[in-house]
């Protein structure tokens, strides 16, 4: 792997000037154009979804959409399977910061109309949804009916398909695992056009049932390189109107690690959500949530943090721990789930620097946040070069007992705060994330998002040092982010045994790109 010398990356004075203007004044375009456009898009799409639910047209439409996908694949097979298959979703709609290069010479299959909720089964306690359904859609649909997902990742625009083919972790994950672990079945279309329904049936008797069973475990994290996901059946649980959220300040790194380990007991009956934020290397806050019907007395605080005029959540947390060592609030459930959406965690502070100003919040924040897809589509190349040099967007998944070492390394290499910490339960199952030395273990997602000013930061070299540490502790790297691992290093991090077997047995090798070719940095621009 060739590394670019840092001296070759240094911009000219003119480039620095242009970058400064584009970075610090991007809001001039975002606020008057992207905010209204995002608000209009969300309003129209929400109205469309309400009509679809009212007339119950989604199930019949789903059959037609799947048939259209099968027809496209039949045509591709009849033409001799001459190119690789990819979905036709535009690159700017994906959650990755980069645009895919592997799609340029591939056959694009139109799967981009799969964005409906298909069925709610309250007897089996499942919801069936197409892969384009977002977490915002699901939370709105389910909570109004008294249900929720055990794991519902925070950002509104995250999709079912992205969380299965990629990865999903959320504050309920310490108890239920990753998003893939709450899925009970997948509906997929294979490269030959065959429609399959696959389940994790451990009691499978026939050879075909065993084949389909193994396919179920091969799909998560596979990035759509085995089949086309057209629907998923997902567990649901009953919910209450509020989350009783306890904020606990920690004053040292060791205290954070010890307390977070203690609080991440998945057998706890009084805790339903666990996450933490580090505001510098020592100061942090652990947040413990519990489903609740609301406050028992008038003295207890109800905080609807999802209202447009409310502070960005992470700033609210920091304000609280600066005043008190421990606080309790009652937050409406949907507001809690999407607590990081309004500020896109803390990325919006660089795009709209005054976005948390009280005047802006009251006058303009009802249109926030700008859609991530629109931000990505309108990022100019000159700004991408700046991001290449200084922007960090990484989620590293490491064993919880290695958290202190991991934070030490992140502080040394990138020093971006806040830092997101989300513990999750990882059980050993077949697939790319198979644990090789345990049956189950508590992990933690360490998320670093933003622009670093750390001296000596080099996008490739620094990322490779982080990747090396994660591999050394049997951790994993979320593959939406920039990945600089070699093919061999990727195979060291992820267990490709089942993946490669299903690729061969399901005739995928000539049909889909290899997963490494899709997620490596050279496959994206």
From Swiss-Prot:
InterPro entries for this protein: Diminuto-like, FAD-bd_PCMH, FAD-bd_PCMH-like_sf, FAD-bd_PCMH_sub2, Oxid_FAD_bind_N
GO biological process: steroid metabolic process
Documented EC number(s): 1.3.1.72
Subcellular location field: Endoplasmic reticulum membrane; Golgi apparatus membrane
GO cellular component: cytoplasm
Biological or metabolic pathway of the protein: Steroid biosynthesis; cholesterol biosynthesis
Catalytic reaction list: cholesterol + NADP(+) = desmosterol + NADPH + H(+); lanosterol + NADPH + H(+) = 24,25-dihydrolanosterol + NADP(+); 5alpha-cholest-8-en-3beta-ol + NADP(+) = zymosterol + NADPH + H(+)
Keyword Endoplasmic reticulum applies: yes
Residues covered by the FAD-binding PCMH-type domain: 47-239
Membrane topology, from the record: Single-pass membrane protein
UniProt keyword list: Endoplasmic reticulum, Golgi apparatus, Membrane, Oxidoreductase, Transmembrane, Transmembrane helix
Residues passing through the membrane, by range: 27-47, 214-234
Superkingdom to which the source organism belongs: Eukaryota
Family under the similarity heading: Belongs to the FAD-binding oxidoreductase/transferase type 4 family.
Protein name (record): Delta(24)-sterol reductase homolog dhcr-24
Name of the gene: dhcr-24
């Amino acid at each position: 792997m060739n590394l670019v010398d840092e001296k070759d990356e240094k911009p000219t004075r003119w480039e620095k000037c242009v970058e400064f203007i584009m970075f610090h004044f991007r809001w001039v375009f975002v606020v008057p154009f992207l905010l209204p456009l995002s608000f209009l898009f969300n309003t129209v799409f929400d109205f469309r979804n309400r009509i679809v639910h009212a007339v119950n047209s989604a199930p019949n439409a789903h059959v037609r959409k799947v048939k259209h996908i099968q027809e496209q694949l039949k045509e591709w097979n009849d033409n001799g399977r001459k190119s690789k298959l990819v979905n036709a979703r535009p690159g700017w709609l994906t959650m990755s910061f980069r645009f895919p290069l592997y799609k340029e010479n591939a056959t694009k299959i139109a799967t981009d109309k799969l964005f409906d909720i298909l069925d709610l089964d309250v007897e089996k306690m499942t919801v069936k949804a197409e892969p384009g359904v977002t977490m915002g859609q699901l939370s709105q649909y389910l909570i109004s009916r008294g249900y929720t997902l055990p794991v519902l990742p925070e950002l509104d625009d995250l999709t079912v398909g992205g969380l299965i083919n990629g990865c999903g972790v959320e504050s309920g994950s310490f108890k239920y695992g990753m998003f893939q672990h709450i899925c009970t079945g997948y509906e997929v279309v294979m490269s030959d056009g065959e429609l399959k329904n696959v389940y994790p049936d451990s009691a499978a008797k026939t050879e075909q049932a065993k084949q389909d069973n193994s396919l179920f475990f091969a799909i998560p994290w596979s990035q759509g390189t085995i089949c086309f996901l057209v629907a998923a059946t997902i567990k649901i649980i009953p919910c209450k109107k509020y989350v009783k959220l306890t904020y606990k300040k920690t004053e040292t790194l060791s205290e954070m690690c010890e307390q977070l380990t203690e609080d991440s007991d998945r057998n706890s009956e009084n805790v339903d959500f666990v996450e933490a934020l580090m505001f510098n290397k020592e100061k942090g806050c652990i947040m413990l949530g519990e489903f609740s019907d609301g406050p028992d007395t008038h003295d207890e605080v109800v905080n609807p943090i999802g209202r447009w005029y409310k502070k960005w959540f992470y700033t609210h947390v920091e304000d609280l721990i600066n005043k008190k060592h421990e606080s309790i609030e009652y937050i409406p459930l949907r507001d809690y789930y999407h607590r990081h959406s309004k500020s896109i965690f803390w990325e919006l502070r660089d795009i709209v620097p005054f976005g948390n100003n009280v005047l802006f919040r009251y006058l303009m924040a009802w249109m926030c946040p700008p859609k991530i897809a629109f931000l990505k589509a309108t990022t100019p190349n000159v700004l991408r070069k700046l991001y290449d040099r200084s922007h960090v967007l990484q989620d590293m998944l490491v064993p919880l007992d290695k958290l202190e070492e991991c934070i030490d390394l992140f502080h040394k290499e990138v020093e971006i705060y806040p830092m997101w910490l989300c513990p999750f339960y990882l059980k050993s199952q077949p697939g790319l994330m198979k644990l090789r030395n345990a049956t189950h273990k508590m992990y933690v997602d360490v998320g670093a998002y933003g622009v670093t000013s750390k001296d000596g930061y080099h996008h490739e070299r620094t990322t490779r040092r982080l990747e090396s540490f994660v591999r050394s502790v049997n951790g994993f790297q979320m593959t939406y982010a920039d990945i600089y691992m070699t093919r061999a290093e990727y195979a060291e991090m992820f267990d490709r045994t089942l993946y490669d077997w299903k690729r061969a047995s399901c005739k995928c090798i000539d049909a889909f790109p290899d997963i490494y070719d899709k997620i490596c940095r050279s496959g994206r621009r």
